[in-house]
A protein has these predicted regions:
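Short, polar loop motifs at secondary-structure junctions
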Residues: 13, 29, 38-44, 58-62, ...
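Structural motif
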Residues: 52, 113-114, 137-139, 173, ...
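Binuclear metal-ion centers of metallo-dependent hydrolases, dominated by the metallo-beta-lactamase
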Residues: 132-133, 147-231, 303-349
């Protein structure tokens, strides 16, 4: 590496998250700091109370929706591809393909480029801008599904199973667990693309974010609240709720529902059984193993840093392929099984 600065002097792991000493800012800090670059709106990456937040306009809108208009003292919205500078450090945001407004932070200083991916995926998502690979010296990646066993099927195939079940069980409501930000809207759009034109019923926790997505140009079709209905009123209909609501008294309003859960973890049958899921749908907002490897091969980093997740498989891949790698083991980033109903809780999928 020919740069004038070492990677660990540009970005370093700290108890509060990744810190940039020359720029004096953090990326996705897990506690309030003076200056934060936020990659996306999920609660384990986007927290309230920072002095200043640099993020895409959509992420800032999501944070304001979830935490209130005073979630930060200073907002700095940056468009995809636009560069902001602080203390001579350039920060450019490029699409991550995770959820609406999600971005990778491209940090450049003294000839060294480091990319903080945040959470990302590579497959098409009708609700957000697709991932953009950026060649760099150091790529800092998540590893939620960082094992070869995690090879997810096509989304259309999984949604097709849901539509097929609706045809097989026309008298039973189909209750789908999907995270309030990103996954719920994606499942709705995938259902629309599969030809499902009937109203989709939603838990109250989804309503404000659904409206935000609609304002940002994502057409969700007819949406109705899943409240105030007779117990057998939703036979043959789709209702979407945060995953924990399926196991909560909220779900008792449905008579003998088919319970489904949209998550990459549904590839693990024991997890589906543990949750009592009748119809597991393998739909993830995180890169699976082939997508992770595709990304590394495209960005061609000299070093690979792994922030959180199952790093052992990726460390072994890097060793075999002659790429220097290290696991940062950052704390505070939850996997999608930890979601609970309510604002400000981990809810990425």
């Amino acid at each position: 590496m020919v740069s004038m600065i070492r990677p660990e002097d540009l970005l370093r792991p700290t108890p509060a998250g990744l810190y940039c000493p020359p720029g004096d800012f953090y990326v996705d800090p897990n506690r309030p700091v003076d200056r934060a670059v936020v990659t996306h709106g999920h609660a384990d990456h986007a927290r309230s109370g920072h002095g200043a937040v640099l993020a895409t306009d959509q992420t800032i809108k999501i944070m304001a929706e979830r935490y209130g208009e005073d979630f930060t003292a200073l907002r700095q919205p940056v468009a995809y591809g636009e560069t902001a500078s602080h203390n001579g450090v350039d920060i450019r945001l490029v699409p991550a393909g995770h959820v609406l407004g999600s971005a990778q932070a491209v940090v450049t200083y003294q000839g060294l480029t480091m990319v903080v991916s945040g959470d990302y995926k590579r497959r098409r998502d009708p609700t957000c801008t697709p991932f953009e690979p950026v060649p760099c010296h150091v790529f800092i990646s998540e590893a939620t599904f960082g094992l070869p066993v995690f090879t997810h099927p096509p989304d259309a195939e999984e949604v097709g199973r849901l539509v097929q079940s609706l045809g097989q069980f026309p008298d039973r409501a189909h209750l789908v667990g999907a995270y309030a930000l990103g996954k719920a809207q994606r499942v709705i759009r995938l259902l629309r693309e599969a030809g499902w034109e009937r109203p989709i019923y939603v838990h109250g926790a989804l309503e404000r974010l659904n409206r935000l997505y609609e304002r940002e140009g994502v057409d969700l079709g007819p949406i109705l609240p899943a409240t105030g209905l007779k117990k057998d009123a939703l036979g043959g209909e789709v209702a979407i709720a945060p995953p924990s609501a399926i196991q909560d008294r909220w779900a008792r309003r449905f008579a003998d529902p088919v319970t489904a859960f949209a998550s990459g973890w549904m590839l693990v049958k024991a997890r589906a059984k543990q949750r009592g899921v009748e119809l597991p749908l393998v739909i993830s907002d995180h890169a699976d193993w082939p997508e992770l490897i595709q990304t590394f091969e495209e960005v061609k980093p000299e070093e690979l840093w792994i922030t959180h997740g199952r790093e052992e498989g990726l460390l072994r891949w890097a060793e075999i392929n002659g790429v220097k790698a290290r696991a940062l083991r950052l704390v505070g980033y939850e996997d999608e099984d930890e979601e609970v109903v309510g604002e400000g809780t981990p809810d990425q999928g």
